[in-house]
Amino acid sequence: KIKSEKVAKIAFQIYDQTHKILHNDQNKRGRSLLWAACFLYNSGKQINLTAYHKHSWYLIKNCELLGYSLSEKNIIAAIARYHRKTLPKKRHESWQNLISREDKSTALDMSLILRLASAINKRPDPVISSVDIKLTNNEIRFKLISLDQNKNLILEKWSLESCYEVIKELKNLELKVD
């Protein structure tokens, strides 16, 4: 639960600072689905660590999530599925389950935010207090703010930089990390 809370906190900071940059969520529906995904995306680790994102998708898709419609549950499952490794493909059942273009857009945008938040939170203990995000021209710059000024953030920076190709492909932005 603590890791999920850390990831959700950073995910919401990214969400709030990147409206119309990484997402176009007008009615904050994506934000509430992102919140659920932050708490469920790791659930597949109980089955298999290597492909846990796929198992998380299966578990979320097939469980009863009170308060969420079938469409919303499919989006939450897709956010968890695509927060790591490959991007959606037409042949993926997890992508085919998303009916509308809006659902696909929400799932893709929120999974990118979860991917970034998860990358920043690799350690068991919290080390990042917040992120500051700036957009200039075609560059998105992340400044990681540590809980401890003496803490080396090389793991977090390296992990976040691993998202470079995905951000470039999806949003045509150059990722920079300070």
How should each PLM-predicted stretch be described?
Residues 1, 22-23, 168, 172:
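Glycine-centered secondary-structure boundary/capping sites
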Residues 3, 9-133:
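Divalent metal-dependent catalytic cores for phosphoryl transfer on phosphate-bearing substrates
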Residues 123-175:
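Low-complexity, glycine/alanine/valine/leucine- and proline-rich hydrophobic stretches
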